[in-house]
């Protein structure tokens, strides 16, 4: 072996690295845009680009000293840095959530440990004015050794932290060689068991920083808000000798506010200190992210930084920022891109954060590791609170084999392996300090999180103690402190916020009833996997009911997947866990974001945006026109933030649309009243829709952007949908003769315009032919199954055990009669699966009118032994030529009984193709709830369905069996039919893939109900 085994030594996490420090990019002059221009500094040399690379299946296969000068790299290939070697065909991708990808044997890793050798030659001229050189790696997974010009520089680990080496003595003028050996696994792997794809290599930026001999090395900026002024304290330490340092503060227009010089600061970590007073300061918050510029000047070097003035505290278990009780409207975010993997560039980062702002998020958690430094600078600029999390997760220790697998024993053993093991105190403390030190000057960071899902013990007690001792201006949290052993008492004194993952509303209420002394934070909630989440509004309501509940962070921002080009059918091909032949994986559990891998929004993101809209209508008096609004922003006056657009729709027809500029203040968390002058017709289903639009553009959002809406049902003499009412009325009867013929199996009804065949054995229609054209591809069905959503993953097995996926209808008795209207057919029907008792008993009455219209009324009784139904309704397989549809209901995108807040009532004209929501893991999608009628159309033929009560429908080219069977969307095959599901109801969506059970009010648990539907056939819309 050509390197020492530091990678299995808990005592050696770093060798020859510089002490942790705040992030900055020094220059010889004041820098402009810090993010965009970070590599434009004349003191920074970027090493990103093409490197020579050779992969080895095992560290033992690497026998040659590739790092030596003159080594022949002709056998190497070329890769881009930053990058991960799995994307270049080396090794393979693996997704695992909890379980380790290696045996649980810390600190040891498999002897066949893959590694990658990187080499880059570069020219370098030692600058006379800045002769010292520091080599920075911002992210390498999992550990690495470094050589320059054949000389060993050092070793480091902690994948998502910056490692800095002093390479002054090994660089030379002219050509130099930089060599890096990266190992896939190290002892740090046991602390990096985050829920993500596992990738390896140099995945973040590499660069040299040139500096004078004597410079400001580290500094820490804190702020205190006093009456009519802010106090900025800057503490600093030096590399080399302390030198005179001037500090200048500029406002956002780059007007000088104040200047100071450092004075000695005896007896502290930092040797020097300066205090700057700002009169009538502009405070930083996510809604008004005002930033000052701080410039630190020494001879030969300038450090430029942006600072925000804000103050954080907890009082009476309520979290305040700048004296305002806040709510985190947050999301968890991983570094993930389907093409580049862990490698996230500036534009990718900007897009994520811009979409968050547009969707009304005000906070992001860096789950579960530090992000690149400019992520936090962008959050400062765009306005997002941040929970900054250390690179620490040992969740896999929970998966150890235990003879006694009860939860108490699992929890005890989980802690003992690592989190309550004194041998891991240095590693845990190191990861915490690396996180805190680098980003301690970022105003966006409100909370330091010690990590994720490690259990609790002495390691975190020490990390929390250090964090509170070093930075008393921010708060701390650590969710896994919840998991404890009964073997000893734990120290929780340095945890400021009690955080929980996926608590039910009842669990939240229990916490509130205890009169807690710490704020409650939902560090993860509303698991957004696939078609979901469906419970955002419920959590919103309880979050805003209690000041102690300071908000939450949805899990998570994006689906994780690996893009593999186009499939043979032309569809984009995304792969997830298990698709790479890996033995240990967690399937599609990584597909749990609010956006697709390419950042196309899921409907769940649209739902979030409207649930967390900036304002809400509290009440509307139709008589006086008084509309009461409540401001749900934390800091801004509504009249300065939004303008309104209101419209009146009746039966889907737009009657009125106007813009309204707020003239009076509506302060944060307060209510205000405006007057609207609207006219409402005497009949029709009428709605007032009030939309909220951004009044002024920002650096990330365009003026006029819609930030959400409210919809109010208006009162009138006849509030029924008049089109639906007309469709329900029996049409004028024709004199056409109706003929009936009957066999043991079928009842056939014929006129000069239609021919229908009713199956007496199923109680459903076998054929529907109008004007000589058959409408159905296959017989009509009763339908209680849906392709399980990701959030059905726990109830799904109950449904399968109950036979819902294979149930069939049978009729026990069918008889008919003819009257003046036409034919009435009476059937007694059940729904059952093989080997299981019947689920449903149904008394059905069908009517065939002489006009050709068909209606049905079903009285349904469910066996109470069975679980909640996925759905109940009728399924039609229409000919595939039915490509267009109109409907009145909740749209334009999919809606369900608990996932419908981003939809509004209207008349929508669309296509079957547009109804499909193309989740990467196929599942139920594209349904619409609260509908009055549906019309499907092909050339010269329409099929209309209408009910006396609002119903749900789904129209798709894909059968629910196909959606259930296939694992990836690119594998889906169209049925050839236009499949129409007309449902009395569907089960709700929820977030039970990782969250609580679907709430009772959204479960389809009715034991008796009545379903009716009417079908009309014609030649025009």
Task: Give residue spans per PLM region.
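Beta-strand/loop-rich accessory regions of lumenal/periplasmic or secreted enzymes
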Residues: 87-89, 184, 285, 677-684, ...
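Beta-strand-rich binding/interaction modules
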Residues: 148, 229-263, 626-631, 635-659, ...
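An acidic-aromatic loop/edge-strand motif
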Residues: 87, 92, 99-108, 157, ...
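Intrinsically disordered, low-complexity Pro/Gly/Ser/Thr-rich segments with frequent PxxP/GP/PP motifs
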Residues: 262-279, 653-683
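Accessory beta-strand-rich segments of carbohydrate-active enzymes
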Residues: 3-15, 33, 37-38, 52-56, ...
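Extended acidic/polar, glycine-enriched regions
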Residues: 172-175, 235-313, 686-725, 729, ...
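Extended substrate-binding grooves/exosites of carbohydrate-active enzymes
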Residues: 1-39, 96, 190, 211, ...
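Catalytic cores of secreted or luminal carbohydrate-active enzymes
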Residues: 194-215, 569-621, 625-628, 632-640, ...
